[in-house]
């Protein structure tokens, strides 16, 4: 449902942010 879509989007955003942070280190 919508909640699952939001959860998936949140995970994608978290993954992108994490990768950006790791690249900076």
Swiss-Prot record:
Tissue occurrence: Expressed by the skin glands.
GO BP terms, alphabetized: defense response to bacterium; symbiont-mediated hemolysis of host erythrocyte
Domain of life: Eukaryota
One GO cellular component, as annotated: extracellular region
Subcellular location: Secreted
Pfam families (UniProt xref): Antimicrobial15
Keywords: Amidation, Amphibian defense peptide, Antibiotic, Antimicrobial, Cytolysis, Hemolysis, Secreted
Residues where Isoleucine amide is found: 25
Annotated InterPro entries: Antimicrobial15
Sequence similarity: Belongs to the frog skin active peptide (FSAP) family. Ocellatin subfamily.
Entry function: Has hemolytic and antibacterial activity.
Protein's name according to its UniProt entry: Ocellatin-K1
Species in which this protein is naturally found: Leptodactylus knudseni (Knudsen's thin-toed frog)
Lineage: Eukaryota, Metazoa, Chordata, Craniata, Vertebrata
